[in-house]
Amino acid sequence: MHFAIILLFLLVIIAIVYTYVDLIDVHHEEVRYPITVFDNTRAPLIEPPSEIVIEGNAHECHKTLTPCFTHGDCDLCREGLANCQLFDEDTIVKMRGDDGQEHETLIRAGEAYCLALDRERARSCNPNTGVWLLAETETGFALLCNCLRPGLVTQLNMYEDCNVPVGCAPHGRIDNINSASIRCVCDDGYVSDYNADTETPYCRPRTVRDVMYDESFFPRAPCADGQVRLDHPALNDFYRRHFRLEDICVIDPCSVDPISGQRTSGRLFHQPTVNGVGINGCNCPADDGLLPVFNRHTADTGMVRQSDRTVANACLQPFNVHMLSLRHVDYKFFWGRSDHTEFADADMVFQANVNQLSHERYRAILYSLLESHPDVTEIVTVNMGVMKISVSYDTTLKNILLPSSVFRLFRFKESGTAQPVCFFPGVGRCITVNSDSCIRRHAGGQVWTAETFTNSWCVLSREGTHIKVWSRASRYPRGDAPAALRLRGFFLNNDRERNTIRAVTTGDMTQGQQIDALTQILETYPNYSV
């Protein structure tokens, strides 16, 4: 019963829904109304003008800067893109006038003007290196950063900031481009300076005036080894006048090899003389391979003060080995001058390999060896060369406590008359017995006997500590008169061969009539013979 009622109820609901849907589903037919087309075949055609002129504003804000407060104030401008531009910083406006010339106008910070700005513009401008610039273009103004000192700080292009440091080169760099005062940080050996004409800082080589009071550069006395006080009596007064302090320590000028620039054991000395002037020069220890020379180019302007006598003012150290290790060393000297016992009159001739040079610069004075040594027949090797250095201004007029130089060693051996500390004769014969012993002074009768019965000539003799030639130059056979004496080898040890004196005759040095001329010149030296 209940089931039948429920079924009947559902059928009624379905019937109601179906009836409602049928009622709302209405179809309308589209009604089309006819449209009447207008006939314009007889209407005349419009003929537009070939040129349309739109009148602009009469006021040109770019020719006459126009102050403003709002963008509306710029509607009067002929420039259509003009807006009210407020300036936060001082800016220079560059405009071309009616005369065709560029004119600059300064706009102060806080002022506003009607301007048409180009979209291509600089985004920033360092006030320490640049200034804002409005440059007139075809479309308006371009806001640019104009570099104040492009030689110091520049820009990558015209639309960039001035932030590329290029100054102070090549020996330094700019310290800080964001500083009001730009200065240089310079490399070692250079100092920052300022050119007032160009208003530009730069790096220049350091001079003495930059460090004269810097104790890290010029220490104060007591001075270390290899340095001397500025008031040293042997120093040139020129350097002393540039310092107010006399106890400043400077490099000993004799301790620097003038060719290689290397430091050596050479030392400056001053020896007082009777007349009170004194002798100034360099002492060059022979044991350290130093050779005393006189540099005439720095005689007046060098650090060594000139004295009343010409003395060695530099020490050379040409070899990186001891001179005894060299292939050949010859000491050639002349004995005829009146001051022979005080000053050397000598040259030294070396045969050395290029690998034995202490510095590359010494190659310039090492010449190719064209002949073998006069006393030794040997093959000349490829890398062997000859070097000649004058030691003529070495002196014994200095403190005996100083390390011995070449000439002092020579004088020590020259004064010896007993083996092994002496020089031996390598030419002539002055006595019949023990003629090869140390060079000594013999009586005239002994010399006559030796020359007569041995058919030889007496050559080497002495007068006190001074070795001389026995006879005048004109007495010897033509071409046999000694013009110089030489020691083969180096007399640092007592080897007989290294301490034997040989003669360089007039015939060895020249020929023909020049032999007679040279002989006459030798006759003019009072100390030539005993």
Swiss-Prot record:
**What Pfam families does the entry give?**
PIF
What keywords sit in the KW lines?
Answer: Membrane, Signal, Virion
Q: What is its main location?
A: virion
One GO CC term on file:
membrane
N-terminal signal peptide: 1-15
Protein localization: Virion membrane
Tagged with keyword Signal:
yes
Relate the protein's function as given in its record: Per os infectivity factor that mediates the specific binding of occluded virions (ODV) to the host midgut target cells.
Tell me, how does this one assemble?
Forms the PIF complex together with PIF2 and PIF3. The complex also interacts with per os infectivity factor PIF0.
What is the protein name for this chain? Per os infectivity factor 1
